[in-house]
Amino acid sequence: MYSIENYKDNIRFNKQYGEIRKFLQIIADNGYNEHFHWGRFDWMMAHSYLDVEMLSKNVLFRNENGEFVGAVMYDTSFNDRWYILHSISDENLLGQMIEYVTKTDVGIAAIKANLNDTILCKLLENAGFEKQYLESVLQIDLSRNLSFQLPQGFYLNAPASEIDNWQWRLVIYHGFDHEGIPQEPSGEVAKAEKHLEISEYIKTFAIKDGEYAAHCGVWYNGGNTAYIEPVVTVPEHRGKGLGKAVVYEAINRAKEQGAKRAIVLSDQEFYIHLGMTKSSEVSTWVKSSK
């Protein structure tokens, strides 16, 4: 039996946060966990939409030596659950993780599993779960030469340049099709968003007349895999190739630091046109207790 430990006190950045982040970094290049990169976890924990009051539903699994070997988690919204992440494919561990989900979710239980995680998928099938929705993880090989051209009047921020946090907020807000002016965060959310200023979050911006028009964030901290999130262009500058420019520039900067590939969780044609191909698929497995 593995011990189960709930995420404590519904606090974003407690001691367990560091443990989970380190764990996800260790398994980042493991194919069956690639859909929940540590960058996705960091983005989630700093996000203003995070369901903070449900954080204690996330659980850590430890072996008899107290070593962290797995986690069952949701992503940002509690409705986007559950992800089973593990460093070992022991059937006893995976069975215990599945049991946690079925006991926690009365009625309908859902688990997101990478189809490369063959042992977990087989256990889900044997437990009466049905495979339903599919999502893709796309990848691009960074041994390629990724070049681009910016339209006249635009330029990119230099790697070591200071970022205008208000412009950064505006490009994300308008890039996700919100109108008007975003509210300044306060309290806990403001503190959480400060976490996004870490160096492992590589940020590129396409700029015109001092205003940020497009942005790509890439998460990288060693290993083979860099993670792309988010990618946005403000509505008035779409269709100009800015998205391609900021993505290629961001992943080229990760390549300079040692990344061999970059991944994104998406099925969008935009990424296919950038030369990305399917790395794996993630299915939602559903079981009803009714």
Locations of the language-model features?
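Hydrophobic beta-strand residues of extracellular immunoglobulin-like
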Residues: 57-60, 202-205, 248
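Short amphipathic alpha-helix that is part of the acyltransferase structural core
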Residues: 1-42, 149-184
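Acyl-donor-binding surface of acyltransferase catalytic domains
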Residues: 75-79, 86-154, 281-290
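Glycine-rich acyl-CoA binding loop
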Residues: 93-94, 239-244
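Conserved donor-binding loop and adjoining core beta-sheet/short helix segment
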Residues: 2, 7-11, 28-102, 208, ...
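Conserved GNAT acetyl-CoA-binding A-motif
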Residues: 104-115, 254-266
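Conserved active-site tyrosine of GNAT-family acetyltransferases
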Residues: 120-124, 271-272, 276
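A mid-sequence, solvent-exposed acidic-amphipathic segment
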Residues: 171-221
